[in-house]
Amino acid sequence: MSLTLFAVYFVACACAGATGAIFSPGAWYDSLKKPSWVPPNWLFPVAWSTLYILMSISAARVSGLAMENELAVLGLAFWAVQIAVNTLWTPIFFGLHRLAGGMLVLVLLWLSVFATCVLFWSVDWLSGLMFVPYVIWVTVAGALNFSVWRLNPGEKPITL
C-alpha cells in the first residue's frame, strides 16, 4: 500500500469530516426528540475517525490494483461518490436542519457505501472487509436519522 495514496484518500476523508466542525450539532440538535437507543455523543468522532482511516487504507490498497483490474477503477469511482455524499449530510442535517433531506442523503450514502464495499471485496477481500463497519455504521445512522425525523414532525418545507 502506498502511503502517498493513503494520505490523498485520508485528506479527502478529513475534508468530509471537517463539515462536522463547520456545522456542529449545537442547541438545535440537543432540543430534538431522539430514540432511547441513540449512541452517546463521544462515540461519533471515535467512530468516524476509525472509519475514515479504514476507508483510506482500503482505497489505497485498491488503487494499487487499478491498473490491472477494471472493477478496482469502478470501486474507486464509487468511493469518490460515497465521500462526496458523505460530505453533504452534515450541512443538510445540522446546517439546514432538514431531517428529511438528511434521510435522503443517508439513503444515497448507504447505497454508494454498499456498492463500494461489494466492488472492493471483489478486487481485494481485505479492502472490502474494511468497509463492512462503514456499512453497519451508516445503517445505524440511517435508522437514527429516520427515528429523529419521525419523532420531530413539522419540518419546514424546503423553499427555493
UniProtKB/Swiss-Prot annotation:
Pfam families: TspO_MBR
InterPro entries to which the protein is assigned, alphabetical: TspO/MBR-related_sf, TspO_MBR
Gene Ontology process terms (BP): carotenoid biosynthetic process; chlorophyll biosynthetic process; photosynthesis
Subcellular location: Cell inner membrane
Protein name: Protein CrtK
Domain of life: Bacteria
Family statement: Belongs to the TspO/BZRP family.
Topology term for the membrane: Multi-pass membrane protein
Keywords: Carotenoid biosynthesis, Cell inner membrane, Cell membrane, Chlorophyll biosynthesis, Membrane, Photosynthesis, Transmembrane, Transmembrane helix
Record field: transmembrane: 3-23, 37-57, 76-96, 101-121, 129-149
Keyword Hydrolase: no
Pathway: Carotenoid biosynthesis; spheroidene biosynthesis
A GO CC term assigned to this protein in UniProt: plasma membrane
Organism: Rhodobacter capsulatus (strain ATCC BAA-309 / NBRC 16581 / SB1003)
